[in-house]
A protein has these predicted regions:
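A short, Lys/Arg-rich alpha-helix, primarily the initiator
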Residues: 1-32
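Residue-level signal for the short linker/turn that defines the boundary of a DNA-recognition helix
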Residues: 13, 24, 37, 51-54
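The DNA-contacting recognition helix of HTH DNA-binding domains
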Residues: 26, 39, 67, 81-84
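DNA-recognition alpha helix
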Residues: 27-37, 60-66
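Key DNA-contacting residues within the recognition helix of helix-turn-helix
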Residues: 30, 39-43, 57, 71-72, ...
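Recognition helix of helix-turn-helix/homeodomain-like DNA-binding domains
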Residues: 34-51
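DNA major-groove recognition helix of helix-turn-helix/homeodomain DNA-binding modules
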Residues: 53-73
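Short amphipathic recognition helices of helix-turn-helix/homeodomain-type DNA-binding modules
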Residues: 69-108
Length: 112
């Protein structure tokens, strides 16, 4: 193991907790993605292995689409799409402790 590998491992990401809160699996994101996204990329993103900006954005789009597909029409109107800097703590503009505007929707969707 070289010295740089520790710099690329950022530990569990907010994405991991948010996927659990929404009741999503890696497969849900891969299935929802219109792009070429694979299970390995999603897993690396969840566990904190540093992704390129392009891959972070792919994962972010798949995450938002997977949630969107579970929402009813009236819920879609209030859904706040997550930017990548809410999902990865090493991305530029990340702020810990943000209040999630979708907390109410999470409970409704998980209850189904």
């Amino acid at each position: 193991m070289d010295d740089t590998s520790g710099e690329r491992d950022h530990g569990l990401q907010p994405l991991d907790a948010m996927m659990e809160q929404w009741g999503l699996s890696n497969h849900d994101l891969v299935e929802a993605s219109p792009e070429q996204l694979n299970h390995k990329q999603v897993q690396k993103g969840r566990k904190g292995r540093q992704l390129t900006l392009h891959t972070m954005q792919k994962v972010m789009r798949a995450f938002n689409i997977a949630i969107w597909n579970r929402l009813k029409k009236e819920e879609k109107e209030t859904f706040f799409e997550y930017p990548h800097n809410w999902l990865f703590n090493y991305s530029k503009g990340y702020e810990a402790g943000r209040v999630d505007p979708n907390d109410g929707l999470k409970e409704v969707v998980r209850g189904r």
